[in-house]
């Protein structure tokens, strides 16, 4: 039997239930802005050495929680674990980011693709279980654990391009010239992501997030067909947790503010939004069907403390202008920069918790 949660504010917010304050966590909260993370990564020898070790992954997952009173932990891993398990030869070059030795470019490459055996990703599921155990203090679990995956489209971008890209010329060329091949890749990716997230849920993930990092690179109409439809398939394929309760699902398309109405119809419990979106309008546009997560510009954290506090208050007030503060998870609009001063994060966390409590006393 799992330990009860000491702090379930994050899960209640995802379910749009009343909360005493606005919970927060940060995308890339375990990362290079923390000196303790860099020390652990040095011991691991490489990024993959870090990500593929359940012990190291557990250590770095807990580091931001030991420094700040965050309301959720997120599994330390990488979105490219799934295509790596497909045998595409993932490596991380210093200063260049991820690279695949065998990108998916030809009809033969696509024909050779298959959903990977989840046993090859056991290190991820072992990390989930180990993190859940490590979160327990005095018989209670400190905060919930989030699992995650890249979206089918975002994974396809890396698989076809062979790494990151400024213009996605190769993958978009395939999409327009051979949509049949692209749909085949996306079908395999969606099936793999469903298996992957369900295995994380079985291992103990209490919420899951789908990162559609490159969905915003698509044209209107194309996004709905080649990204959103496959994320909806993923949401539909996820199962309940060990307690029989639905595990909340968060969808995040960076640059996807144009499509919030459609995203809210996927069955997801929450939508991540970036800093280009007004949260009050986002609530209206989504009709109260989903919780919202976001949406501070990460570069605000390079400002002075007073400016950080002012921008935090602006985000919280924008959401509360919709009538209440329920159903809001505070986050950045994208991942935290590696150059962020750790003390700025302390200011952010304090202001979110303090001001959101005060704001609730002023709301009807």
Swiss-Prot record:
UniProt GO BP: protoporphyrinogen IX biosynthetic process from glutamate
Catalysis performed (reactions): uroporphyrinogen III + 4 H(+) = coproporphyrinogen III + 4 CO2
Pathway: Porphyrin-containing compound metabolism; protoporphyrin-IX biosynthesis; coproporphyrinogen-III from 5-aminolevulinate: step 4/4
GO cellular component, as recorded: cytosol
Localization: Cytoplasm
Binding site for substrate: 28-32, 47, 78, 158, 213, 334
Major localization class: cytoplasm
GO molecular function, one term: uroporphyrinogen decarboxylase activity
Database matches in InterPro entries: UROD/MetE-like_sf, Uroporphyrinogen_deCO2ase_HemE, Uroporphyrinogen_deCOase
CDD domains: URO-D (cd00717)
Site (Transition state stabilizer): 78
EC number assigned by the record: 4.1.1.37
This protein's UniProt keywords: Cytoplasm, Decarboxylase, Lyase, Porphyrin biosynthesis
Keyword Transcription regulation appears in the UniProt entry: no
Entries under PROSITE patterns matching the protein: UROD_1 (PS00906), UROD_2 (PS00907)
Transmembrane segments: none
Domain of life (superkingdom): Bacteria
Known function: Catalyzes the decarboxylation of four acetate groups of uroporphyrinogen-III to yield coproporphyrinogen-III.
HAMAP family associated with the record: URO_D
NCBIfam families recorded: hemE
Family membership noted in the UniProt record: Belongs to the uroporphyrinogen decarboxylase family.
Oligomer and partners: Homodimer.
The protein's name: Uroporphyrinogen decarboxylase
Organism: Ralstonia nicotianae (strain ATCC BAA-1114 / GMI1000) (Ralstonia solanacearum)
């Amino acid at each position: 039997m799992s330990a009860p949660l000491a702090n379930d504010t994050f899960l209640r917010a995802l379910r749009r239930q009343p909360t005493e304050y606005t919970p927060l966590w940060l995308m890339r909260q375990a990362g290079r802005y923390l000196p303790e993370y860099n020390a652990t990564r040095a011991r691991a020898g490489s990024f993959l050495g870090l990500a593929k070790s359940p012990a190291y992954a557990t250590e770095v997952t807990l580091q931001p929680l030991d420094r700040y009173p965050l309301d959720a932990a997120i599994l330390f891993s990488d979105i490219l674990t799934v295509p790596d398990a497909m045998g595409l030869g993932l490596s991380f070059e210093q200063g260049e980011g991820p690279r695949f030795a065998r990108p998916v470019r030809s009809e033969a490459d696509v024909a050779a693709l298959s959903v990977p055996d989840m046993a090859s990703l056991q290190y991820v599921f072992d990390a989930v279980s180990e993190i859940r155990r490590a979160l327990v203090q005095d018989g209670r679990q400190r905060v919930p654990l989030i699992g995650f995956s890249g979206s089918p489209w975002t994974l396809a971008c890396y698989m076809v391009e062979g790494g990151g890209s400024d213009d996605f010329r190769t993958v978009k060329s395939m999409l327009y010239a051979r949509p049949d091949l692209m749909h085949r890749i996306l079908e395999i990716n969606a099936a793999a992501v469903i298996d992957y997230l369900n295995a994380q849920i079985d291992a103990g993930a209490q919420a899951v997030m789908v990162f559609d990092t490159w969905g915003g690179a698509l044209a209107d109409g194309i996004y709905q067909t080649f990204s959103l439809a496959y994320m909806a398939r993923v949401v539909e394929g996820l199962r309940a947790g060990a307690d029989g309760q639905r595990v909340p699902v968060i969808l995040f398309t960076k640059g996807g503010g144009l499509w919030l109405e459609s995203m809210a119809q996927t069955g997801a419990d929450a939508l991540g939004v970036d800093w280009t979106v007004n949260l009050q309008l986002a609530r209206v546009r989504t009709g109260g069907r989903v919780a919202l997560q976001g949406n501070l510009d990460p570069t605000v954290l390079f400002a002075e403390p007073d400016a950080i506090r002012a921008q935090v208050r602006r985000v919280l007030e924008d959401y509360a202008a919709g009538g209440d503060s329920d159903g809001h998870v505070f986050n950045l609009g994208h991942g935290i920069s590696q150059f962020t001063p750790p003390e700025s994060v302390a200011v952010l966390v304090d202001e979110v918790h303090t001001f959101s409590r005060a704001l609730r006393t002023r709301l009807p």
